[in-house]
Amino acid sequence: ALYTRRIGAGPSGYGTSIVDIDLATKLTYFGKSTDLGLFVVSEDSANGGLGGDFLSSRVQHKTSDLTLGHRLTYVERSALDREATVQVADMIWRKSENMEMRGQILHSDISQLANPINAQTRVDSQDFASWVNWSYAPNDSWYHILYLSHYGDDFDMNDMGYMQRNDFREFFGSTSYDRTDFPDSSSFLSSSTVLEYGSTETTDGDRLSLWTELDHSWTFRSTRQLALEAGGAAARWDDQITRGNGMLANS
């Protein structure tokens, strides 16, 4: 949720160049089971500048198999009459040495009053996002991943973070198998097989992607390599290329 390139660059979409920084402070504390962090920046907003004030805090508590955390980001741009607050609760659960689950729940609250600088654009939006990732490696050969995410229509963390888009749900899965136990008489040193698959759709259920891919590679004792790839994708919609003017079908 924190993307430091937002700082010192001015607000996106307003044609501003680099903005001077008046104040920057970073404090961190690493304890036996609890970590704390604070990050504060104030940009120059004199003479009609579009500088803003940024704050980010981080709290994380760790036990033997569970890590819980919270992050807050807050941005105020007085020239735009804009305030943006994003809160994130996150979790890492290590069920065993072979299995791990990670996840986040995010909430954004954006408030902007209309004024001449922001082209009389008023914003009052709140929304949620979340994702969860499960990984499992039962042995040295097999590795599995499953990933699910949901980003609400009005979720926005771009004031102090980065996201490609909102209004989508995504599913991704991957299974890989590595083999290194070829006999000495074999010309193969190792092989790897990876099956990946995924789908993305808008929150209204319009398909943005549906695909699968299978890769297999061999590494010879001579260090030569051979790889085969196969995959497929279904027809999909593109809801961004028209810039808000409907959906475009892509085969």
PLM-predicted stretches and their roles:
Residues 1-6:
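Acidic glycine/proline-rich low-complexity segments
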Residues 10, 14-90:
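A conserved hydrophobic secondary-structure block that centers on an alpha-helix together
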Residues 19, 40-41, 59, 75, ...:
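Extended aliphatic helical segments
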Residues 20, 106-251:
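Exposed, low-structure sequence patches enriched in small/polar residues
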Residues 24-26, 35-37, 67-70, 88, ...:
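Beta-sheet entry/capping signal
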Residues 25-29, 40, 61, 72, ...:
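Hydrophobic side chains in beta-strands
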Residues 31-33, 61-65, 76, 89, ...:
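Outer-membrane beta-barrel proteins
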Residues 79, 84, 91-94, 98-117, ...:
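Extended, well-ordered alpha-helical scaffold/bundle regions in very large, multi-domain proteins
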